[in-house]
Amino acid sequence: MVNVEIHATSHIGRVRRGNEDNYLILNISRSRSWTSSQEDGEFVVESQTFEVDGNGVVLAVSDGMGGALAGEVASKMAVDTVSEKLLEADPEETLTPEASQYHLIAKLYNATVEANHLVHEQGRTDPQFQGMGATFTGMGFTPDGVDIIQVGDSRAYLVRNGKIYQITKDQSLVQQLIDAQQISPEEAETHTLKNVILQALGAQNEIYPVSARLAPNSMDVLLLCSDGLSNKVTAANLQRIVVDNIDNLAVACAELVKEANTNGGEDNITVVIAKLTGDNLEQANTEEVQLELIDMGNIHDTADQDTAEVL
């Protein structure tokens, strides 16, 4: 048995006039979903606990962009479309037997692609939404593992055995420059093109989501967030706040938002935290965190391996 304890919140921050972020909590077996619905002046932490079964539990963060109400519409379209598509008839029968263990990431991938098409079409045909888009970073939990999908620069972190790992890579121009060794990570923090991302839902008709799988350990804490959090709270402080509140992660959500606002709060702030427990999970260890990169074009083939680094 595997259980997942979930806490999520979204906050307008201190500067923005509206909240263009959104989050998703989805229990597929129960056909129940939760998204950010609080008013701009409210602060609410949504908390749920589920047993993870073969149908899976999905979490996501989406950061909208586009001005006026366009960003808010884009992120809501993203989480709503993904939720609706995942609750439709199961396409598992179309997969090969070897691929059946990947049924949730296949569904999540297809739902993300469909969300992109809908956001892109809305922006193309409706002048008030022209140019709108949204990031989308999601996680799917099944007994086979934790599946991760990413479009844009909303991040996923893992806190394991008191250490923190960034398990996604920003799909951004400055990250590309870092990879090419043209700038340092420190220089990226103040780079004039810091906010330029390489892909987003709605920006183009075609997207290429990055997909991966993590083998979870007992007491792993997974964290999804928009850049309103990751730009304002260092990895070390993320780790400290999560570890200090490991027995009350709803408080960790509140403390993370408070920290981001204390450091300026110029952007909307969204965070989803999930803690895994259960007899079927490996005990936490200090080994390297291995990510299995999944080729969605040939899903049953042996996937590449990547390693997450301690931050």
Task: Describe the role of every protein-language-model region.
Residues 1-311:
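PP2C/PPM-type serine/threonine phosphatase catalytic domain
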